[in-house]
Amino acid sequence: MFGLLVNFYRFCRKKTERKITIALLGLDNAGKTTLLNSIQGEVDRDTTPTFGFNSTTLNEGKYKIEVFDLGGGKNIRGVWKKYLAEVHAIVYVVDAADPGRFEESKMTMAEVLENQFMRDKPICIFANKQDLPTAAPAAEVVKGLGLATCRNSHNVFPCTAKMPAGQDVDHRLRDGLKWLVGTVDREFGRLDPRVQTEAEEVRQEEARKKKEREERLRKQREERLRQQKEEEERAREVEKENELHDGKAPSLLAAGGGVVGAAAAGVNGVMVDEQQELRPPGQHQEAPEALGLHNGLALGLPHTIESPGKFPPPPRRPLEAHPASDLRLVAPDQGVSSASGGPGLGAMPSGSHGGGGVPPQPASLPHVRAALPPLPPSAPQPSDAGVGSSGSASRHPGAHSSSAAAPPNVASGAAAEDGPEPDAAGTAAGEAGSGSVFAPRPASAGGGGPGSRGSGSGMTPDARELGSGGVESGEGTPARLRAGAQQASDGGHGNSKGSFSLVHTSNKVVPVAPDLRAGIPGAPNDA
């Protein structure tokens, strides 16, 4: 029977017991944790500043009170709003001995009351540290915090959280707690469902944000892993490429076809193998092979190759010839000594123009004439026949206007420089018949056999070198020509631009002005 009564009492007490949640707020150094310890009866317990959140459970009558002790620092006040949806009431602690912070405390409490979850919830205000001489009374605290305009149920209780040693806990602490619990009890039927609903909404919102945050972190982690994998694959490809091509011939040479395949053979006939190493000379490869590969690659690549010159190259100087110029200035007339100091050449017989006469060979350079190859015949041009005869003008005494009577050492259509100036008729005729000295002209345009001299036209460098006939057959003049030619600048119409001499030096035919002939080795001076 006694056991049944005990169980019935416990059942009734459990049914009437209610749970409420209270948030303990206030600025830093206001005494929040000390006040909570005093309510619990732990007066002598040392406290430290609260950084974050502490939870404590109290029993008051039929209520089980859960207290959230939140830190009051500036960096911690931002987290207060996360707990306001779960509380039924608030305990706000003010340092009454520090009136200078009333304004800061007022702004902080106003931000809390403006939160949507604090609507119509009671507030218990403790004006702490009343034992200090600078402590403000409750009326000044109400004025300093601006509680006159507060719409929430509120009440101010001056108190001293930390009593001197040997004294009991300040009863005003218990009075303020009883007032708050009684106010919540009167509104419990309205507050509790609202607190449960708002707390659930906040938990769901927090869960949703947490899930989004985790999803965002997961995507970022996957993106980092993907980028890391791509970088590793790219690094492996580069490493593989380096292993395949580092020190090896390029893959384009392995094809072996087209221009590149043909050019890969090299210049000296050295074939480049596909696996042949390309290294500088002295490092596992000889210099000629590397040079051949370089030239082969250069030929295989697209290049713009200029077309060769239109004029045939000048004859190469024979090895046994004199190292000076092959074209030397000589006296063009009879009885005049040659440039080398030998006897005079004399006049060319008239029969030589017809191909039957053999001119006398000079005794100065017989080995040069014997070493030169015969001049190949060239095709005649229509503009050469019978034109240069009337245009030839000689400055030598006794010179004729006909090309057949011209000195053998002077090309037709050119004026020699040793005689007087030609007259107007000779100059006009020369302008009509003279051509470019570099244009190829036939040697037989004036008629005659292989040894005849062409008239009225310029001559190729080979013709000026060899004279008018073949050397081996003994035909033509053996004299070295003194080409005092007038170069045509308008397509061969004979506009005189000045005199120059053709000097063959270092395998090249170079036009030299008369005043510069003294500086050329082997070229005599007119003076």
UniProtKB/Swiss-Prot annotation:
Statement: the UniProt record of this protein carries the keyword RNA-binding: no
One GO MF term attached to the UniProt entry: GTPase activity
Keywords in alphabetical order: Cell membrane, Cell projection, Cilium, GTP-binding, Membrane, Nucleotide-binding
SUPFAM superfamilies: P-loop containing nucleoside triphosphate hydrolases (SSF52540)
Residue ranges, compositional bias (Gly residues): 445-457
Biased composition (Low complexity): 381-444
NCBIfam families: small_GTP
Family: Belongs to the small GTPase superfamily. Arf family.
Summary of subunit composition and partner proteins: Monomer.
UniProt-recorded name of the protein: ADP-ribosylation factor-like protein 13B
Species of the source: Chlamydomonas reinhardtii (Chlamydomonas smithii)
